[in-house]
Design a protein with these regions (language model features):
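Short, glycine/charged-enriched secondary-structure capping and boundary segments
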Residues: 20-23, 67-69, 120-121, 147-150, ...
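Glycine-rich phosphate/adenosyl-contacting loop at the front of the ribokinase-like
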Residues: 1-76, 116-118
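Alpha-helix N-cap/helix-start capping motif
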Residues: 38, 86, 199-200
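Short glycine-rich anion-binding loops that position phosphate/pyrophosphate groups of nucleotides
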Residues: 10-12, 97, 109-111, 138-140, ...
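General beta-strand structural signal in soluble alpha/beta enzymes
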Residues: 7-8, 80, 106, 165-166, ...
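Conserved N-terminal subdomain of the carbohydrate kinase-like
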Residues: 50-137
Length: 202
């Protein structure tokens, strides 16, 4: 039997006008969830492998509960999720059409994972019996505290013998807390067995 795969990162509420309508045209938004690491967890479960998603969500929050239900629907184990102070991050998407590019507006400041501190997540417990750990460069970009959590996660995963994959997923506009990706990511990458990148990440 395959050992579980754990992915770690932020999940956000995705709000988008239907079809190709623009923000200023539409009286409604379609609500779904979005996050690169959660997408990987769902994909892993789709291949029939045991999959777990780790994040920090606000407590006593119906949106958090709805997301956990969505994970279960796709066969992802949400049992590692930690509840902490803060809010649920949101992003708005306007789908592009023809020559008009898509537009994304983020509203994630003060999200639960951005406010989580080193020690709020017991990574040793989360990684017990796990075979593979996946993270992206989005998590350390969110905040200094999230960057510390990301480094804690890969360091402990490596110490416990897990295979580690890191998708750089460089988002220039996210790195606003004082350090750049070039300053932060090498410390994470030295623990990785697999690095996923493209020409825009360099």
């Amino acid at each position: 039997m395959h050992k579980p795969v754990v992915t770690f990162g932020e999940i956000m509420l995705r709000l988008a006008p239907p079809g190709f309508e623009r923000f200023l045209q539409s009286p409604q938004f379609l609500a779904t969830f979005g996050g690169g690491e959660a997408n990987v967890a769902v994909a892993v479960a789709g291949y029939g492998l045991p999959s777990r998603f780790l994040t920090v969500l606000p407590p006593n929050n119906p949106i958090s509960d709805a997301f956990i239900g969505e994970l279960r629907r796709f066969g992802v184990d949400p049992g590692l999720i930690v509840r902490g102070k803060g809010r649920f991050g949101i992003y708005f998407v306007e789908n592009g059409a023809n020559q008009r590019p898509s537009k994304v507006v983020y509203d994630r400041e003060g999200s639960s994972i951005a406010l989580a501190k080193s020690g709020d997540i017991d990574f040793a417990k989360a990684f017990d019996g796990v075979g593979w750990f996946h993270i992206t460069g989005i998590t350390p970009a969110i905040s200094e505290d999230a960057s510390t959590l990301a480094l804690d996660s890969v360091r402990i995963a490596r110490e416990m013998g897990l295979k580690i994959s890191i998708d750089l997923n460089f988002r220039k506009n996210l790195w606003q807390w004082g350090k750049t990706a070039q300053q932060v990511m090498p410390a994470l990458l030295k623990h990785a067995h697999v690095c996923i990148a493209n020409e825009e990440d360099y």
